[in-house]
Structures are given as structure tokens and as C-alpha cells.
Regions:
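Active-site-adjacent core segments of small-molecule enzymes
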Residues: 2-6, 20-265
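Long tandem-repeat architecture
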Residues: 8-10, 14-19
């Protein structure tokens, strides 16, 4: 009888297969997981673009975050104590569609020294609605200041969950969503946003103010990487919902384009 071709002569199983109790292998074990598929796609797109898989091109500027605590403490010192923090802000189009086509917009917010000197906090915000349901949905936008930017998925803040968002304080005319017009708007005057949080099903609660500053002399495909899973605070972090898929996609996108370590300022 010919030898069983599914098992090598020494009785071991090839490393890409999983042995079942009867000695056979399970083909399902070789199928990529959701996180694996997301990672492969993100790495492939980032390698082709030599830019992030999503939000590939953006406008970067300095900003100032002023935290003004109100109401009950959150259980996170960064939000419970007044303070001012230097910020690097990157405004971008999500898919990178050309021209003035509607596209979801993103704000990548890097807060310096949020948990003491040398610490980093990254928040990734996407244009969304403000209602109890629409605040969780990415919304394409023609006017960059027409509505809020939220984390879409909740954060664990102290002992509770809440969504984080910035709401534009609109004092200027329509800002079209092209990179050129975004750059011009930031260059023309400081743009202000109210930083807010909302527990599930509840109203927004003010946390402070984010104000844009001078533009950075960085190319639109700036390779600085933002990662809210690596750069977080002890008592402020993304919840576990979709965390495996998102972490895998962020890491693969960095590998695909050869980005710098997101833990470096």
C-alpha cells in the first residue's frame, strides 16, 4: 500500500497544517482569518501606493489641545486635570479619491506628553454624524467643516465606554475637501474644534478645545504612522471590538510602505 501522502514518513505534519486527533489535517486551519485578510489587503495597497492603505495623502500642521474638565471625573488624569498639550494633526481624505469627489475625511491627532514627558497618544477620527447612530458611521463630506469627526468605535475611559469626537467651531465659509483647499484653510486662520465624549446613547460632553497652528513642511504622502493601539493611555484605550482586525491592518500598512515606528515622535 502506498504511504499516506498527507503525513510525511517521520509522522510529523507540515507547519502550515493542523493535525486532528485522528492524524488527518484540517484544511480550514490554512484559511486566512479576518485579521489575516485585512493585513494582506492593507499591505498590498500600501506597497502599491507607497503611502497608507487608507488616508494616503494629507495636510499636516501643529495644533494645541486645551483640556478643561467638566462634570464627573472620567478616571483618566489626562481628561480629569486641566492642561495644554502640543499636538501634531494630519487632515486627510480616506480613500484618496481624486479632485472634489465626496470622500470621508480623517483627522489623525497625536498628543504629546499626555501621560507624562515622552509619552504619545494617537486618536484617529473620521467624518461622521453627531446623532446616537450616525456618530458611529463614516460619512463622505464635501465641506470639511460641515460636521464632527469621531473615533466611530468606543473607547474605554476609566471604568466606562465612550465615543470621542471633535466638533468644528465654524467661523469660516465652506472648506472644500481637496487637499489644496484644506491646506489653504489651515494657512489662512486657526481652526477650532471642541473635543467631546459621549457614552453609549447619551449626549456629547465637552472635554476641551483643539486649535490648529502652523503648517508642517511635509509631503502629502507623509510616512509618519499613527496607531491608536500602540499609542494609548493606561485608562484611555480602544475597546476590544474589531481590535485584532484593525491592529493587523495598521501594522501591515506600515510594513507595506516602510513607515517609521509609530512610537517615535
Amino acid at each position: 500500500m502506498p504511504p499516506d501522502e498527507t503525513v510525511p514518513p517521520d509522522g510529523t505534519v507540515p507547519p502550515d497544517e493542523t493535525a486532528l486527533p485522528d492524524g488527518t489535517t484540517d484544511a480550514r486551519a490554512r484559511r486566512p482569518t479576518g485579521a489575516g485578510l485585512a493585513a494582506r489587503l492593507a499591505q498590498r495597497v500600501a506597497r502599491r501606493r507607497q503611502a497608507p492603505a487608507l488616508h494616503p495623502y494629507g495636510v499636516t500642521c501643529d495644533a494645541l489641545l486645551t483640556v478643561r474638565p467638566t462634570g464627573r471625573p472620567w478616571g483618566e488624569p489626562w481628561l480629569d486635570e486641566p492642561g495644554e498639550y502640543a499636538v501634531r494633526l494630519r487632515w486627510s481624505r480616506a480613500v484618496g479619491l481624486p479632485g472634489r469627489l465626496p470622500d470621508a475625511l480623517g483627522l489623525a491627532v497625536r498628543v504629546y506628553d499626555a501621560d507624562g514627558p515622552g509619552s504619545l497618544l494617537d486618536l484617529l477620527l473620521t467624518s461622521s454624524g453627531s446623532g446616537r447612530r450616525t456618530r458611529h458611521l463614516p460619512l463622505p463630506r464635501l465641506d470639511a467643516l460641515a460636521g464632527p469627526y469621531s473615533t466611530l468605535l468606543p473607547y474605554r475611559i476609566g471604568g466606562q465606554e465612550a465615543l470621542l469626537a471633535v466638533h468644528p467651531v465654524v467661523t469660516s465659509p465652506l472648506v472644500p475637501n481637496t487637499l489644496a483647499r484644506l491646506r489653504a484653510a489651515v494657512e489662512a486662520e486657526p481652526l477650532a474644534f471642541d473635543l467631546c465624549a459621549a457614552p453609549p446613547g447619551r449626549a456629547w460632553r465637552a472635554l476641551g478645545t483643539l486649535t490648529t497652528g502652523p503648517l508642517h513642511d511635509r509631503p502629502p504622502d507623509d510616512r509618519v504612522a499613527y496607531d491608536p493601539y500602540l499609542n494609548r493611555l493606561p485608562h484611555l484605550r480602544p475597546t476590544a471590538w474589531l481590535s485584532g482586525l484593525r491592529e493587523a491592518a495598521y501594522a501591515a500598512s506600515r510594513r507595506g510602505r516602510g513607515a517609521a515606528d509609530p512610537t517615535e515622535p
